[in-house]
């Protein structure tokens, strides 16, 4: 794209949506591949054991190997370099070990249970870990969810799991044993096991990307003066699936009384509106105004389209047309900053990040990054400008990078998914005027679909060729 190419608000057809897509389970072959990837990385970096923590909010690394999270309890999964696996679970998750995708020895630790539940079979965590045996381990990785990336501290010595667990591991190891944060083995952009997805995993995650974008379009189409935030919030949640972000349906002044959730507040003409929903595999987010045309904008924001929405949309188009497999994340970051200067538009987060079970897993796109963008990575387009005196703008959606081999695998193994991808591609190219490269496969139905005026439901920003 020529960055100076003309952008106009134009009447277009609504994007395709798909309402009856069934979830895709991860296959046994995929789960075996996941375990092998982690074991290979353990060998490469000389780890004897990994101790992986999980709770409801921080369970993705645990779930990557086991297939489940311990919901309202805590849990530990211990993986030895030999492949030996152990589960340490509370009262209400003992049954889950027999359903786990990777089998292992079960240890009951009732202190992982909810307060005041029975403490039968109580045994110290030190004792359980001693039974698993770390006595000969020279290097142990503790993994919660977060990979720390401080420029001032030793990231390997910062742990995001409860202190009593860290202390128990220290107590049962030899003095010489090295204990480090090893989350990078899972989510590090350079080589983390979870950063690259096969065809089965992309099909698995596309379910959530399709669901979030389908729900988003339903909510956008329901925007009317007088509609309540809670009504839109209900449309954003679908099929009983657990969100991986807080659902947002917020109009006018946000965060009143520190509230984060949709309320009974009604939409008014001229108000700002933010909508967000997300599931495993992708988030959809929109921000704009409850108006039909620029004439209905607040007097001091009549140029919102020219000052805010169009420059943002141009950058989304540039992002899609210029991201490449094999480029450094730092190179792409620099390209985005050149066409959408931080100094002018005041964005400060990464202009794109990896997506998986969690909405933001990690990002190879940061200043001077030498992490390579690879086939199989699933990305969220995530650029958040802050322009003083103006309402916000957003069109966050999900894509994957796929080389020819991966595209052929998806086509052959999941032809219905490939059909959806092709319909989305056609829409992006022919309705929105974007030259979408073959290696960029849209997992969301609303990639680059931006309606800045919510009451004008037929007009979106497009590229004029």
Regions found by a protein language model. Name each.
Residues 1-465:
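Active-site neighborhoods and metal-handling regions in enzymes and metal-associated proteins
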């Amino acid at each position: 794209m020529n960055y100076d190419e003309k952008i106009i608000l134009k009447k277009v057809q609504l994007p395709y949506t798909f309402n009856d897509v069934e979830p895709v389970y991860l296959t046994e072959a995929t789960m075996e591949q996941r375990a092998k990837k982690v074991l290979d990385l353990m060998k490469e970096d000389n780890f004897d054991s990994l101790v992986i923590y999980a709770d409801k909010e921080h369970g993705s690394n645990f779930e990557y190997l086991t297939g489940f999270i311990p919901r309202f309890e805590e849990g530990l999964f211990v993986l030895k370099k030999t492949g030996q696996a152990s589960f340490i679970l509370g009262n209400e998750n003992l049954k889950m070990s027999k359903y786990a995708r990777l089998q292992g020895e079960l240890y009951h630790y009732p202190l992982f249970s909810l307060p005041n539940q029975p403490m039968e079979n109580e045994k110290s965590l030190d004792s359980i870990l001693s039974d698993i045996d770390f006595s000969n381990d020279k290097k142990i990785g503790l993994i919660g969810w977060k990979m720390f990336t401080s420029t001032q501290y030793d990231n390997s010595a910062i742990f995001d799991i409860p202190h009593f667990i860290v202390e128990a591991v220290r107590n049962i190891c030899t003095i010489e044993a090295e204990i480090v944060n090893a989350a990078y083995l899972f989510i590090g952009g350079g080589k983390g096991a979870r950063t690259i997805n096969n065809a089965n995993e992309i099909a698995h995650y596309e379910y959530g990307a399709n669901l979030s974008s389908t729900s988003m379009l339903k909510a956008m189409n329901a925007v009317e003066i007088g509609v309540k935030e809670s009504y839109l919030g209900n449309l954003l949640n679908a099929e009983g699936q657990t969100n991986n972000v807080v659902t947002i349906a917020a109009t006018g002044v946000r965060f009143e009384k520190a509230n984060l959730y949709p309320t009974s507040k009604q939409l008014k003409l001229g108000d700002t509106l933010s909508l967000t929903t997300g599931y495993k595999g992708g988030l959809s987010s929109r921000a704009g105004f409850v108006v039909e045309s620029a004439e209905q904008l607040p007097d001091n924001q009549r140029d919102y389209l020219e000052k805010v929405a169009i420059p943002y949309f141009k950058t989304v188009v540039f992002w899609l047309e210029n991201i490449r497999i094999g480029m450094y994340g730092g190179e792409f970051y620099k390209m985005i900053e050149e066409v959408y200067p931080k100094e002018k538009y005041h964005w400060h987060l990464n202009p794109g990040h990896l997506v998986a079970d969690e909405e933001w897993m990690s990002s190879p796109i940061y200043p001077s990054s030498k992490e390579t963008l690879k086939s199989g990575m699933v990305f969220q387009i995530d650029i958040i400008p802050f322009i003083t005196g103006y309402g916000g703008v957003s069109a966050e959606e999900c894509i994957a990078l796929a080389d020819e081999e991966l595209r052929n695998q998806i086509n052959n193994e999941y032809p219905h998914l490939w059909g959806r991808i092709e319909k989305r591609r056609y829409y992006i190219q022919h309705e929105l005027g974007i030259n979408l490269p073959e290696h960029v496969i849209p997992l969301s139905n609303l990639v680059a679909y931006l309606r800045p005026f919510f009451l004008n439901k037929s007009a979106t920003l497009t590229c004029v060729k």
